[in-house]
Amino acid sequence: MWQTASVGDLRLGIVHGDAQSLAGWGFAQEHLTDAAHRDQARAWFEQAGVDAFACSHTRLPVYQRLRRADGQGQAWVLNNGAAGMPNFQGDSAGLLTRIATTPLAGSNSRASVVHRTVHIDAVAITLCPAQLQQRFVAQWPPGSDAHASYFSRIAAGPDYHAGQVVRFETEAVLAAAAL
């Protein structure tokens, strides 16, 4: 369940959720802390024949580097978290993932990695906090399940910081130990 594209020398799988489901959470940052789950992700990379999966949907961003199943090279999960909601505490911006053969010009990258010749950035999407909150409350007033689940995130951002986005496999092991 993916679309493929090539950007420079990067073969990319594009999904909404994960490699198995449109609504999947297999590329969520909290699942990537589990070694057995990273093995499953490695299998998805081999099945798709890609170097990276770009995804969204899982609320918190993570750019997770994994060793390939054959031990030769690396693969990346490039998860932007949420385009339409804050991703970091105290930062009202949404995020999109830019994957390009040239570096990003400007200062609106919240996290970045380079894979061979390809530049990957979590680019901030400027949102007006007051307008976002007003539109949200008009759609999902206090007392609704959505308000209970998301309003505090929209108002202040989640308890997550830009320094937590880029992770290498050894860091995923340490993050799991901290849970």
Predicted regions and their residues:
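Acidic, His/Gly-rich catalytic cores of divalent-metal-dependent hydrolytic chemistry
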Residues: 69-179
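Active-site environment of divalent metal-dependent phosphoester hydrolases
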Residues: 20-22, 52-66, 85-89
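Short beta-strand scaffold segments in enzyme catalytic cores
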Residues: 2-6, 61-65, 95-98
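Internal, well-ordered alpha-helical scaffold/interface segments
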Residues: 39-43, 51, 56, 61, ...
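Conserved catalytic scaffold of divalent metal-dependent phosphoesterases
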Residues: 1-52
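Generic detector of short, locally flexible boundary/turn motifs and exposed helical patches
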Residues: 16-20, 38-39, 60, 74-75, ...
